[in-house]
Amino acid sequence: IPAGQEGPPPHIHPLQDEIFEVIEGKLELSANGKKIVLEEGQSYNVTANTAHSFLNPLDRETKFRATYKPALDIDYMLVQGFDSLNSQSNPNQPSLQMIVDFDFILKQIHGQYKFAGAPGIIFTIFAAIARLFTKPKVKSLKDHNASF
């Protein structure tokens, strides 16, 4: 994760634990309102159904590994999500296309990932409006799985 960058807004994996392991640098996690700072070699297990977010507090890149148990369809969400993110001219300012793509991805994985609190409500409203102007450009779960 680049210097000073935040991960996704507070979110929940209702069916999965997410284990964060810092390989290089430092990672700040927020889980259920509690701040956890992880240094190189440290790990933390965010249990299923726990609202969490993370950021890199350093002025240099942080490398970390996130493991999901069980994996379910996380590979689909990450591959298609990063494809959408990387296709944006400014990934720090979500476009209508990116919002529609993420809305489509979340519908494909049926409740395996959801935004926590207000960001979820705001996202739902923006996605409904954005769908009036554009269609998703990411693969469906079925097409993604067929490509392996």
Predicted regions, residues:
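Structured binding elements
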Residues: 20
